[in-house]
Amino acid sequence: MAKVNGETLDIMIEQSDQPTFKDYVTLAKMGIVRANLITVFAGYVVAASYLTDDVLLYLWQTKLTLLWTLLGSGLVIAGSCYLNNYIDRDIDYKMERTMGRPSVTGKMDGQRILALGLGILATGTVLLLIVNHVAAVFGLIGSFVYVVIYTMWLKRTHTINTVVGGISGAVPPIIGFAAVTPTLHIDAWILFLIMFVWQPPHFLALAMRRTEEYRAAGIPMLPVVNGFAITKRQIVWWIAVLLPSSLLLAHYGIIYMLVMAVLGGYWLYMGLKGLKIKEEQAEIKWASKMFFFSLFYFTAWIVTVVLVSL
């Protein structure tokens, strides 16, 4: 076996500590990027359906615009997530879910993360400007809400952090819509409304599952500050608002209405059942079911919106 001297060993250790491609991807929070790009695409398809009866042909004819829209949006979102990781370094190490991030372990220093975040965000904004200024403006609005209002301010100070932060998650369908027509149709705002109202029950259920982690990090999530009973009532209230909100797109047809009525009705039923649960572990189990159903609801809604628009 070849000998390894001290200098060689130091180099090997130093190289092993260098950030990998996976580390860069981790900081971009690709799960968030993918989910938001799905809604960007949905907004694009919905807007296209108002311009032509052959949406598939339109998508092909405008494939470059769609590409710049998706790429620009993805970079804006990824850059914002980099900035979120940079800002949250001081609390992420306290949470099991986030303590392994390169921003926490030291594999990437803060200055590099900050520079990359700003650079990626700027690049995405330029690409959206190539599409049109309205899409770019909404991209920046979403980034500002997520990075400044949510991450730097409300996440650390108030239980409404999830609600206000939801504005950033509701902006992507408007970006997609604006990429087709800068003059926004009322449906663009309804898509925004549905996405905005969907997020509180989704993230509050997640917060219930991760209550002790948030408590350890000093993040004032609703279940940490006010307990499970109030959080469950809030979840049910938001779902009750979501149900009629989703039906505002009644002109999408009977199939859309049936799908959303059944999904929303069942989710509300699940929520109401949870109000009767008093034992903590059972409440956490209920929260897990609510969280995963929220993902199913989101997926089914997007698929339905796209299919009825084609």
Swiss-Prot record:
Domain of life: Bacteria
Keywords on record: Cell membrane, Heme biosynthesis, Membrane, Transferase, Transmembrane, Transmembrane helix
Chief place of localization: membrane
Gene Ontology cellular component terms for the protein in this record: plasma membrane
The protein's enzyme class: transferase
HAMAP family linked: CyoE_CtaB
Annotated protein name in UniProt: Protoheme IX farnesyltransferase
Source organism of this protein record: Exiguobacterium sibiricum (strain DSM 17290 / CCUG 55495 / CIP 109462 / JCM 13490 / 255-15)
